Amino acid sequence: AEASGLGVLIYSRDWANYTPAQAERLAEIPNVVAWKDGTADIRRYQMIRERLGDRLHWIGGAGDDMVPGYYAIGIRAYTSSISAVAPKLSIKLHELGAAGDSAALNQLINDHVAPLYALRTKRKGYEVSAMNTILEMLGLSGGPVRPPLVEVTESERAELQSIVDGWCNAVFLDV
């Protein structure tokens, strides 16, 4: 990080899942400016955040379904794959999370986010396959996935169509 004059974001993932003490050492590097969680370990992320305070910008990066957990510990930014296909849904997640409306947020997650994330966990790499398929369903360029990833099956394509139809009915998509 010190070799670059650019601001550096630490992206904590399975292979780089830092302890609070390690995070503190990384935060001492002057150009480390942000921390993105990709582990979905809210407990650890909260401990790191409590230890470092406002020294860094904090980003939730484990998925739209993690908005309730991230917002509960004070994170107000997250990466959203749903925003690429249904930006209104992503904005609504943020609005409800920021407002602290847990009941409405959880209902929105259960109705419109959890079904997508359940499908995305069926196979390794399905995060990409599912989103590319939805893009194609919407007439956008999703394109084929690159090996070793695989395309969704026909039955899973039908599941995705049902999810997209639900988003349309809830006015999260203008198609």
What are these regions (language model features)?
Residues A1-N17, V150, V171-V175:
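Active-site beta->alpha loop and helix N-cap motifs at the rims of alpha/beta catalytic domains
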